[in-house]
């Protein structure tokens, strides 16, 4: 899911943090494997929304996409490493269960769309039912290892492992192009630099975006803990979003209350005040209903002859009651609308919202220390797996293996920024005082004093006259 609205906030309040670059040539990049596999699964489908299969009925689209996309990355002078998710944190189980519910709902709606809907409806609902399974991951890991591409299985979140590799200077982090995606979690895991829109598709030519965390923290936030607070408030994968909080209001709240702790306290107090006000309105409304149900106290006294005057009284009372009743109903409806407006609008924080646990995951994520190594592809293994088992074209597989051997084994041309480092400008030296010669080097105060004494002694000895005997 990512961090909602973070890209827009950085563009507005920390524009120096985002810049466009033309190429990642000569870089080593870490790629979130699950996200990539998911995109390949939903990319090409049949008219009925089902996945493309081979002659044996097996789904192979994700393997084909991973094989050829990785080839294009390598051909562009980039060395990729794929990071796979491990066991999800306990805090994420609630989000995963809700995703499962949404997939089941989409499956039912998709079946209805096949009967009454359009092709677009069927495709839309079928995309929502896609899930990356353990079998998908295992087959992709096998393919990548045969290609000579490093595979890292994270102990927990793949984004956290990517950030660890990036902090160690082993890789940069790159994301494939994904329309409308806000996959910025890696920054919250303290990744120094994130590259987005990594694509080599002719139909989706778009410059690569580089997001620099250090530049982002020099904007309106100034500290990494505050940045984490903002990301959690915007909405992350571990907590339900707070209704009524958008990017602008989130930044305003963080600034006003100094962090997420103060924001949560403020929202809790506000919710308690609204709840008390709502209870008071309901109590007043109940007392009004009780008064309406009580009989009029003078009705028995003013009717000595119940038979005759009851008929006349009914004729006279009907118009009065018909006029009075709507007023009371109108007043009660206004009260209900007022009560509904108080309880249903504004910012609403869930009763259970363990933001402290989410912050711990971002500050101290689970990761492993790994060295990455790119090796020669196993050509025979690729032919056995892709051609004999999955029905791929043998000529294309062998040509792809040749490209891998060529680009992975060739000595990679270095980047200029690998030879030079930017240094801050040194302050200009103060001009020497008039009448004193400029020395060629730096002489400390002690050396200067010693030299001055030697010069004075030489001058005095030269000016002395010899003594007469």
Curated annotation (Swiss-Prot):
Record region (Interaction with PCNA): 412-420
Family to which the UniProt record says this protein belongs: Belongs to the XPG/RAD2 endonuclease family. FEN1 subfamily.
Function: Structure-specific nuclease with 5'-flap endonuclease and 5'-3' exonuclease activities involved in DNA replication and repair. During DNA replication, cleaves the 5'-overhanging flap structure that is generated by displacement synthesis when DNA polymerase encounters the 5'-end of a downstream Okazaki fragment. It enters the flap from the 5'-end and then tracks to cleave the flap base, leaving a nick for ligation. Also involved in the long patch base excision repair (LP-BER) pathway, by cleaving within the apurinic/apyrimidinic (AP) site-terminated flap.
SUPFAM superfamilies to which the protein is assigned, alphabetical: 5' to 3' exonuclease, C-terminal subdomain, PIN domain-like
Biased composition, class Basic and acidic residues, residue ranges: 441-459
InterPro entries: 5-3_exonuclease_C_sf, Flap_endonuc, HhH2, PIN-like_dom_sf, XPG-I_dom, XPG/Rad2, XPG_CS, XPG_DNA_repair_N
PTM summary: Phosphorylated. Phosphorylation upon DNA damage induces relocalization to the nuclear plasma.
EC numbers for this chain: 3.1.-.-
Protein name: Flap endonuclease 1-B
């Amino acid at each position: 899911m990512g961090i909602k609205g973070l890209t827009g906030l950085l563009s507005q309040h920390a524009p120096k943090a985002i810049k466009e670059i033309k190429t990642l040539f000569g870089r080593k990049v870490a790629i979130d494997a699950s996200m990539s596999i998911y995109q390949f699964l939903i990319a090409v489908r049949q008219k009925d929304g089902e996945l493309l299969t081979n002659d044996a009925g097996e789904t192979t689209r994700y393997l084909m996409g991973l094989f050829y996309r990785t080839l294009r990355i390598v051909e562009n002078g980039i060395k990729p490493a794929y990071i796979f998710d491990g066991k999800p944190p306990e805090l994420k189980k609630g989000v995963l269960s809700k995703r499962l519910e949404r997939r089941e709902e989409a499956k039912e709606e998709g079946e209805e769309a096949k009967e009454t809907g359009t092709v677009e409806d069927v495709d839309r609902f079928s995309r929502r039912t896609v899930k990356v399974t353990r079998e998908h991951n295992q087959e992709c890991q096998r393919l990548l290892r045969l290609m000579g591409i490093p595979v890292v299985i994270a102990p927990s979140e793949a984004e956290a492992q990517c950030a660890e590799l990036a902090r160690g200077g082993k890789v940069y982090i790159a994301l494939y192009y994904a329309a409308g995606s806000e996959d910025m979690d890696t920054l919250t895991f303290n990744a120094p630099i994130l590259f987005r829109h990594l694509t080599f598709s002719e139909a989706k030519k778009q410059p690569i975006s580089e997001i620099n965390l250090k530049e982002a923290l020099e904007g309106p936030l100034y500290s990494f803990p505050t940045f984490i607070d903002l990301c959690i408030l915007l909405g992350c994968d571990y907590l339900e979003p707070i209704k009524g909080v958008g990017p602008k209001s989130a930044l305003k709240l963080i600034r006003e209350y100094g962090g997420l702790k103060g924001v949560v306290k403020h929202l809790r107090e506000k919710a308690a005040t609204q709840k008390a006000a709502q209870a008071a309105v309901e109590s007043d409304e109940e007392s009004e209903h009780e008064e309406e149900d009580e009989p009029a106290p003078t009705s028995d006294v003013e009717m000595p002859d119940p038979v005759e005057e009851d008929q006349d009284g009914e004729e006279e009372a009907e118009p009065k009651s018909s006029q009075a009743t709507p007023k009371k109903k109108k007043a009660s409806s206004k009260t209900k609308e007022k009560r509904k407006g108080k309880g249903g609008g504004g910012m609403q924080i869930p009763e259970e919202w363990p933001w402290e646990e989410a912050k711990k995951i971002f500050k101290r994520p689970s990761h492993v220390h790994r060295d990455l190594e790119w090796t020669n592809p196993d050509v025979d293994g690729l032919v056995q797996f892709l051609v004999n088992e999955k029905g791929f074209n043998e000529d294309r597989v062998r040509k792809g293996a040749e490209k891998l051997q060529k680009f992975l084994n060739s000595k990679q041309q270095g980047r200029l920024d690998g030879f030079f480092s930017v240094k801050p400008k040194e302050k200009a030296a103060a001009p020497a005082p008039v009448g004193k010669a400029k020395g060629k080097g730096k002489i400390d105060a002690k050396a200067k004093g010693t030299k001055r004494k030697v010069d004075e002694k030489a001058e005095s000895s030269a000016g002395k006259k010899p003594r007469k005997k």
